[in-house]
């Protein structure tokens, strides 16, 4: 592995809209109590396994920022440098933002639902500017004209990977342990790149909330262990299965 640092990926803890099974995207919702507990536990896992981050990267969304703060506090690393970028934001779900996943699936059918939710290159319909769940008036995104109106995973790859290559890789090359606290789809975009996954294979990848995923990288920034290693594999498997089942009607 040489002097290359270690990369730790962490999806935010369960959010209010995760719990309600709503498409969230760029809507800025908070964490549930379960999500806050997941964040604290993630920091404990980092400390227990002596995987203490030197620098943190996160998005501009509070569910990631709060998760990062709670995790760092739990690991006694609140003092490390923090860098935030909209490029780490969740995928923008367009006009689906705020809609119930099960109701959307029932209305449009399984095939269309899965294409919008998990395909690599099929974006949902555009969100209307000025509508309840759009971000065009949000001051966080004034320098990017309010941000996208919809995105597919390919769009997330296109906005995130240049930031990873131009900014984050420098810390890894310097031998630092880098913690990225982000979102299901921004992390899927990065994992696709790291593990060189095909457009077809990425469809089946689900990332659970609140469980650190460790990547040891070689000098070419390729994973020593393909797919990385979850610090709590059993909980990660259960969490990924729960993510995969989203869209099922409630009993």
Curated annotation (Swiss-Prot):
Tell me the protein's name: 2,3-bisphosphoglycerate-dependent phosphoglycerate mutase
- GO molecular function annotations of the record: phosphoglycerate mutase activity
The pathway this protein participates in, as annotated, is: Carbohydrate degradation; glycolysis; pyruvate from D-glyceraldehyde 3-phosphate: step 3/5
Primary role: Catalyzes the interconversion of 2-phosphoglycerate and 3-phosphoglycerate.
Keyword list (alphabetical) reads: Gluconeogenesis, Glycolysis, Isomerase
Q: Which family does it belong to?
A: Belongs to the phosphoglycerate mutase family. BPG-dependent PGAM subfamily.
Binding of substrate, residues: 11-18, 24-25, 63, 90-93, 101, 117-118, 184-185
Isomerase among the record's keywords?
yes
Which gene is this protein's source? gpmA
Quickly give the catalysed reaction. Answer: (2R)-2-phosphoglycerate = (2R)-3-phosphoglycerate
The record ties this protein, via Pfam families, to:
His_Phos_1 (PF00300)
Q: Give the site residues for Transition state stabilizer.
A: 183
Which Gene3D superfamilies did the record assign? Phosphoglycerate mutase-like
Q: Where is the active site?
A: 12 (tele-phosphohistidine intermediate), 90 (proton donor/acceptor)
Biological process terms in GO annotation: gluconeogenesis; glycolytic process
Q: Which residues form a coiled coil?
A: none
Name the Enzyme Commission number(s) assigned to this protein: 5.4.2.11
- Keyword check for Calcium, yes or no: no
What is the top EC class of this enzyme, as a single word? isomerase
**What SUPFAM superfamilies does the database record attribute to this sequence?**
Phosphoglycerate mutase-like (SSF53254)
